[in-house]
Amino acid sequence: MKKFFFSLMAIALAVGTTLSASADNRTMPAEVQRLHDEIRAEFAPDKRVATFDVDYTFSDKNVMLRGQTTSIEAKNKLVITLRKMGYNVMDCIATLPDEESLNGKTLGIINLSTCALRSAPEYSAEMVTQALLGMPVKLIERDGWYRLQTPDGYLSWSSRVGVHPVTQQEYDAWNGAEKVIVTTHHSFAYKEPKADADVVSDIVGGNRLCYEGEKGKYFKVSYPDGRVGYILRSEAMRESEWRENLKQDAESIIATAKSLIGVPYLWGGTSSKGVDCSGLMRTSLFMHDIIIPRDASQQAYTGEHIDIAPDFSNLQPGDLLFFGSKATATRKERVVHVAMYMGGKRFIHSQGDVRINSFDPEDELYDPYNLGRLLFAARVLPYINKQPSLNTTATNPFYK
């Protein structure tokens, strides 16, 4: 067996017969391709929240498996099934998180007001989402940058300055500490409790810092990395008070969305500095302690599906509206945009900037383009904490 392993390794390195399991692969054994697709569909159907990337190197009935996955169950099922199919398997699949590259610290706390999270570990890569200061995350691997998973399940890459790695004990201490919640859209934390003091950092709505006391008009707060700052009490609330006053009704959430009118569209943005369409939904809801999936195509399959009547009479304020292209005989339905219904045929969304438009031809805000690509709606508010992907910081496992 050892001889086989060394021989196969030589083949892999010298001959280069590695095959990736992709839909258009013509040389992968059909039975292996089917198995790969079945396992991916079961354990990692959405690559934005789970990874199952495996390359196969074949020599007759010998196969070397290389790659990585976030699911040990997927890896085990692949190896066991291949062996049952008669293959001699050399398993070199890495299971994430990669504790070795992370030096054992597989948890972290976001350390910037708005941390840009990218599709690859480099500044030139696409920004796919953002994370907010104080947000707990899971660290997956380190390659100069940190690959991490946010509380909505999204996988992405952060620069080292964006996240503070912690032990389980430090993570639990952070989650258990009394917080100060930033409630203004944008401001600053200062080194001293006065407006002309030097700045520690900027802050945005939804940021969470540890409560360390009060001095005059200021909260004293601490950061994940131990820095200390002062935030105006008029721009934040203690978490206990914030929870007592928390409102999760449609009217309050729509008011928060309206307070972002004019904020520029930013691809990948999920903060008051800039939002994309789904980022506006996520930001507006998160300010009311509601966590929803990141992208419009993920948000579309939460809550209760609502078919839209011609007169829009079956819609309620707070419903999410989804836009895109309808299914055809050769193409699946595709969701590319999301908005929030306000009532009276009006909706708020981010397209160029955050704005209000209408489905009513008699309304000065009439938007025929989006009316023409309207698909369906989803009613999410009644399903908070009743569906796995709709939760709050009180129930989401990342915050425990």
Task: Give each language-model segment a name.
Residues M64-Q68, S240-E244, P264-S272:
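Second-shell loop/turn segments in exported
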Residues I110-L133, V182-Y211, Y265:
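Beta-loop motif signature
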Residues N76-S101, E122, T150-T184, K194, ...:
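Boundary regions of SH3-family modules and the immediately adjacent low-complexity/disordered segments
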Residues L139, Y211, F322-F323, H349:
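A generic structural signal for residues embedded in beta-strands
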Residues F5-M9, L13, T17, A21-Q130, ...:
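N-terminal targeting leaders
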Residues P165-Q168, S187, K194-A197, M237-S240, ...:
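Aromatic- and glycine-rich peptidoglycan recognition patches
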Residues M64, K75, V128-S159, S201-R233:
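SH3/SH3-like beta-barrel superfamily modules
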Residues Y265-G279, T283-P317:
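Catalytic cysteine-centered active-site loop
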